[in-house]
């Protein structure tokens, strides 16, 4: 993990990246938070980015949750309000992390286009085959079926990703089955967010995540303080879109009110 320190810190934000990516794709967002007075804590999830494990493969989704737990422990050492921002699969990790805590001890949570359902549907035969392969060949990798231009309209980001050797393009059968299992778990109603301020920020033209499932989850989650905002016309990676400064302002307005 890494820490980017603000000159006059008022809070700490822990950022959890999504599938296939890593911390290097968040340079703009990290600097926006840092220059706004937030220490930023972030790392690469297991099997992604600069981690030494097999890229695109995990044994269990719990590996992600355990890793993020260490990041949050680091954030707490600053004795400042701690916020959690999870994007896409990182949002799913954030949800499951909160559910596992008796007392989350975080000031607020932002979910950016959280992965609570997939737009791209795997055909039934391949899905059935993956169940068997998950037992006999869990590390077998297949093409993710995702293209970079499905995630953002930002041409600069698209060009950078096309030449990025750390961008994961193949995932294991085990990774796929663990993702589906965790999505199913996350959709079970929970009171874990009852006392945690929650902001869900969803791309209006999301080509990766099924936003109807995000709305369903949001409507079903018990919380004394929750808000949903949808960004019309924006693709999945709202913090990379041409309108990202407006998106960031909305995220910061949410966190600032709890400092």
From Swiss-Prot:
InterPro entries: AB_hydrolase_1, AB_hydrolase_fold, Hydrolase_4, MAG_DAG_Lipase. It comes from the Bacteria. GO terms for molecular function: carboxylic ester hydrolase activity; lipase activity. Pfam families: Hydrolase_4. Disruption phenotype: Cells lacking this gene entirely lose the ability to produce bacilysocin and display a 10-fold reduction in the ability to form spores. The keyword Transmembrane does not apply. Keywords: Antibiotic biosynthesis, Hydrolase, Serine esterase. GO terms for cellular component: membrane. The active site is at residues 88, 206, 236. Gene3D superfamilies: alpha/beta hydrolase. Its EC number is 3.1.1.-. Belongs to the AB hydrolase superfamily. Phospholipase involved in the biosynthesis of the antibiotic bacilysocin. It probably catalyzes the hydrolysis of the 2-sn-acyl moiety of phosphatidylglycerol to produce bacilysocin (lysophosphatidylglycerol). Is also able to catalyze the hydrolysis reaction of one acyl bond in phosphatidylcholine in vitro (actual cleavage point is unknown), resulting in lysophosphatidylcholine. This is Phospholipase YtpA. It comes from Bacillus subtilis (strain 168). The gene is ytpA.
